[in-house]
């Protein structure tokens, strides 16, 4: 067995971020293939296909062919042990995605090289900026007609404010895509189409001036490549590890995930350069991965991962020390010690009990309603990890039951889904309405679908006159009580019983903020 320090050194924990349809799920498949976690990559096919992608395991995801929940997968690659967190890339991803990014040490940004920087990528990059997360970039779909690679890199630099350092460079594109030149290894790796479902035997030509290169790709294309590379090397940044680790520079790889080409080059870079498990801040001190006592935080809760078991699993990022099966942990918020002997490890839907886990690893704890997002577990020290946020929703609906007798099941379902971070639920102080808030429209559909399939509750939405929500705080109890009394028509409790101001319009919110200067109206709430 390796010692704790060595176990930490070999771990890399990262998430994949992208715009919908940039090829994130396909890349996840291919990454797992290289890690030998799955033998035949289950490419994301049309809905009729039996071969569903391994990381899209929830029923709704299988139906739609999109990733709705965050899957967690661990696999070995060369001398490292990689923890990959797959995030929803679809239009309406939820806070789940934001919070997943608090549990990783680096990110892989997947860009469709035909389209360049897209809206969702911008939003996700903003989140990675909050913690200066190191970013590796994969320009995907080079086997299709793509934009000029230099132009796409310029767009990344200008729009995402991060310097680009090309590590590989594409040779041709679309039907004439011949492979990539690796700037650091001074070699050309040739592409063979039609082998996307398996590990390829690759042909490599050493050196840019090698006559073999002219034979392999044709002298015209070889000459064009040499000229292009002169320009590229002159006009782009060189890779600098320090700038990468600060989140200021991204190494760029080109390839095709569907054709299973270039993914291994990116994985080589990730395992070589991405940081090992990093320290995390608590309210009192920084905890490093080399601290000997165990600690970890909950960043996600997933209900009904296994319909046979009707269970809920809390996902924990291990920050320090070592988890051992049967160990006693202190659940800080609750103030109780718990013995954990059945923590889980995952490859998307396939679960097995974990014997031990180290910093950087993600483990699943069975949750019977006692664990919340943001909870800290230690070996006794009263710590609370910070930086795991709730965001004020941007869309609201009133939810109604088709069968009024199922109010109890509806409430239970909504509270559990809210604990997961899929949506937020608000209960107004002055009436019995239930208001659901979400970051995007898809979340509403997801909730109604899951209420029906997992809780046997049929519900419908109605429009409601709510523009935004803010969590309210006031140090002066008397002033808070007066505020509650006078504004009760606009106040509600969220799933965690936190007082929330539900504003019908922005004008109304601004007026209330002026009227009650001692009350803080917050857009985000620390868990």
Curated annotation (Swiss-Prot):
Gene3D superfamilies: P-loop containing nucleotide triphosphate hydrolases, Peptide chain release factor 3, domain III. It is found in: Cytoplasm. Keywords: Cytoplasm, GTP-binding, Nucleotide-binding, Protein biosynthesis. Pfam families: EF-G_D2, GTP_EFTU, RF3_C. The keyword Protein biosynthesis applies. GO terms for cellular component: cytosol. GTP binds at residues 18-25, 86-90, 140-143. It comes from the Bacteria. Increases the formation of ribosomal termination complexes and stimulates activities of RF-1 and RF-2. It binds guanine nucleotides and has strong preference for UGA stop codons. It may interact directly with the ribosome. The stimulation of RF-1 and RF-2 is significantly reduced by GTP and GDP, but not by GMP. Belongs to the TRAFAC class translation factor GTPase superfamily. Classic translation factor GTPase family. PrfC subfamily. This is Peptide chain release factor 3. It comes from Shewanella denitrificans (strain OS217 / ATCC BAA-1090 / DSM 15013).
């Amino acid at each position: 067995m390796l010692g704790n320090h060595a176990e930490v050194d070999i771990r890399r924990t990262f998430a994949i971020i992208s715009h919908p349809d940039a090829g994130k799920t396909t890349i996840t498949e291919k990454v797992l293939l290289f890690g030998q976690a799955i033998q035949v990559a289950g490419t994301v096919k049309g809905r009729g296909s039996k071969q569903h992608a391994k990381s899209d395991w929830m029923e709704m995801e299988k139906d739609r062919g999109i990733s709705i929940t965050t899957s967690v997968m661990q696999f070995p690659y060369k001398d490292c042990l990689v923890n990959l967190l797959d995030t929803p890339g679809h239009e309406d991803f939820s806070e789940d995605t934001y919070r997943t990014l608090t549990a990783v040490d680096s990110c892989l940004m997947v860009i469709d090289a035909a389209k360049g920087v897209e809206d969702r990528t911008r939003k996700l990059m903003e989140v990675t900026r909050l913690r200066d997360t190191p970013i590796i970039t994969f320009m995907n779909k080079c086997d299709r007609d793509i934009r000029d690679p230099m132009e796409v890199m310029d767009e990344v630099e200008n729009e995402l404010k991060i310097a680009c350092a090309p590590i590989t460079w594409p040779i041709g594109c679309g039907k004439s895509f011949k492979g990539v030149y690796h700037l650091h290894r001074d070699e050309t790796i040739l592409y063979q189409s039609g082998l996307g479902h398996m590990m390829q035997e690759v042909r490599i030509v050493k050196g840019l001036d090698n006559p073999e290169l002219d034979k392999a790709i044709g002298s015209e294309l070889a000459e064009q490549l040499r000229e292009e590379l002169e320009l590229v090397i002159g006009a782009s940044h060189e890779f600098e590890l320090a700038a990468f680790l600060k989140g200021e520079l991204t190494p760029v790889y080109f390839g095709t995930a569907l054709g299973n080409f270039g993914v291994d080059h990116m994985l080589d870079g990730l395992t070589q350069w991405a940081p090992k498990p990093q320290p995390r801040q608590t309210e009192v001190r920084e905890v490093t991965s080399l601290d000997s006592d165990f600690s970890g935080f909950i960043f996600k809760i997933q209900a009904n991962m296994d319909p046979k078991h009707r269970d809920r699993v809390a996902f924990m990022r291990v920050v320090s020390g070592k988890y051992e099966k049967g160990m006693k942990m202190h659940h800080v918020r609750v103030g109780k010690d718990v013995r954990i002997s059945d923590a889980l490890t995952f490859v998307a839907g396939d679960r097995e009990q974990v014997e031990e886990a180290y910093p950087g690893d993600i483990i699943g704890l069975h949750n019977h309603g006692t664990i919340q997002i943001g909870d800290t577990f230690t070996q006794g020290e009263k710590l609370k990890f910070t930086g795991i946020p709730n965001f004020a929703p941007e869309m609201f609906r009133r939810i109604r039951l088709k069968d009024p007798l199922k109010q109890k099941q509806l409430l239970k379902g909504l509270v559990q889904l809210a604990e997961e971070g899929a949506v937020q639920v608000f209960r107004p102080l002055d009436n019995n309405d239930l208001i659901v808030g979400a970051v995007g429209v898809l979340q509403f559909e997801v909730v109604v679908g899951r209420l029906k399939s997992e809780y046997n509750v049929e519900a419908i939405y109605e429009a409601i006159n709510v523009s935004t929500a803010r969590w309210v705080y006031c140090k002066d109890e008397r002033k808070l009580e007066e505020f509650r009394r006078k504004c009760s028509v606009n106040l509600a409790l969220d799933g965690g019983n936190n007082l929330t101001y539900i504003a019908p319009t922005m004008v109304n919110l601004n007026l209330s903020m002026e009227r009650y200067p001692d009350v803080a109206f917050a857009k985000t709430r620390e868990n």
